[in-house]
UniProtKB/Swiss-Prot annotation:
The encoding gene: argH
Keywords associated with the record: Amino-acid biosynthesis, Arginine biosynthesis, Cytoplasm, Lyase
First-tier enzyme category under EC: lyase
Primary location recorded for the protein, binned into one broad class: cytoplasm
Protein name: Argininosuccinate lyase
Amino acid sequence: MTKNHKLWGGRFESSLEKWVEEFGASISFDQKLAPYDMKASMAHVTMLGKTDIISQEEAGLIKDGLKILQDKYRAGQLTFSISNEDIHMNIESLLTAEIGEVAGKLHTARSRNDQVATDMHLYLKDKLQEMMKKLLHLRTTLVNLAENHIYTVMPGYTHLQHAQPISFGHHLMAYYNMFTRDTERLEFNMKHTDLSPLGAAALAGTTFPIDRHMTTRLLDFEKPYSNSLDAVSDRDFIIEFLSNASILMMHLSRFCEEIINWCSYEYQFITLSDTFSTGSSIMPQKKNPDMAELIRGKTGRVYGNLFSLLTVMKSLPLAYNKDLQEDKEGMFDSVETVSIAIEIMANMLETMTVNEHIMMTSTETDFSNATELADYLASKGIPFRKAHEIVGKLVLECSKNGSYLQDIPLKYYQEISELIENDIYEILTAKTAVKRRNSLGGTGFDQVKEQILLARKELKAE
């Protein structure tokens, strides 16, 4: 007589040591799959009944039992046990306690291999949809903010040095476009997630006359996997998500880095709401951008989850291996981390104050109008390379005497070229510099309006 009381214990003469059992158990984290596991089981037993693999009466009893468990789960009344290893065994054990041995018929024509794969496809499909909705909110917030700041002028940077004046709205629309591509990547990810592994069984399919198309429809998947080995053994849809999540977090992190700089004493371009700031335990004056810093910091954690799963998968032979238990925690963690990061970013932008005057003033005491002068000279017939050299020397001279290009007398400019006129001073203003950059996709005010108009159409279409 066997001493192993596991649902799979028939072949064993002894039980696992408790500490070994704890090492192998996954219920501490895969219980997040509980609602998806019960949903998949409901579809599976419906199919078993309709194909007469089990009787309609048995299918009805099992469905009634699953409904009881679903209600208890929603009410927070289900208790899971480590002795049942994982969420699948826990649900089956709880179902058996509710309806008796007939619960054992639920696992007909099914393995935990296709069961867990189905659960994860359902989970990730659900979370991808939620994440895209949150990105839609973030992108809408960016467009609204950009529309309010089309005419707000700020320094544009390269190498963290003042480069050329730009519209703050233009800067915000750059991030809108990045997050739009992030959304598109998640949409493509959905294509590879919206597949049903259910019915693939352990690896080779089943001898029972199952209807995989029926369970696919019941679970609202696009189509079933066409190869049972592929269905149970790959996790590329999760790796694809973790890769997309890493790119998305990189974009959030870059934006947070700028927000952290902008709200510093040295910049003062923005003021964050108290809701997204914290203080210091010793320095009373501090208002720290902790939420932006945490998003920046948690980006590395999402990267780590990607590399962890890639490493797990790199040498696995087909089909299922226990290594695949390591596919879940990183996925759960990344879903939760990215989701809250998107929400915080959107709300942080909605509640921050933009100090327009400081942004504008910072473009009046720098040399970010140097390109305007070079372009002006080139328009008067001076070769651009020569104009570049002339302006570079003027910048050097101004730097030495504490003046700026707009301070140089017209008489001095006309010594460079008699074609230079008084309009040079209007051209050297930051607002004019921005307005004149009206090439497609440029920072010119009219171009920013076009970008916003296009974005509004994209958002409406979604």
